[in-house]
Amino acid sequence: MNTKTPVVVMVGCYLRQGRSVALEAAARFVQEGRQAVIVEGGPGTLVAPPGVELVQLAPGCVCCVGQLPLRVTVARMIRLIRPARLWIELSQADHLPELRKQLDGPGFAGAIDLQDAPQQFI
């Protein structure tokens, strides 16, 4: 892979609201290219706006019980979808250090560039 995929982790949002905030954020950046969003599972059905690929993982924390599904999903999205930016919704901010450790670890170090969420979404 020649370029790193920017990855933005949206934290501190609660389930239903957080998932829609992540989709809204991605939709605002569609002009830069295809966006991809990974959200924690929860009630209800989500519909991705045009230009946004959405994957909803099974309910549970993505860095604890959902660690393997998250890693597989990130790898597949980067390889197959090749998004201009990948957004990951994380509802509990106290899990951010563990998630960053996983994404900074072997397998992703040369493929992704972890970035802070744009100010308007914090």
What function would you assign to each model-found segment?
Residues 2-31, 39:
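Glycine-rich P-loop/Walker A and Walker A-like loops and their local beta1-loop-alpha1 context
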Residues 15-17, 68-70, 92-94:
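Short beta->alpha connector loops
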Residues 17-18, 43-48, 94-98:
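Short, charged/polar "capping" segments at the starts of alpha-helices
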Residues 25-26, 47-53, 97-108:
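Short, aromatic/basic amphipathic alpha-helical patches
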Residues 39-41, 46, 50-88:
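Conserved nucleotide-sensing/catalytic segment adjacent to the nucleotide-binding pocket
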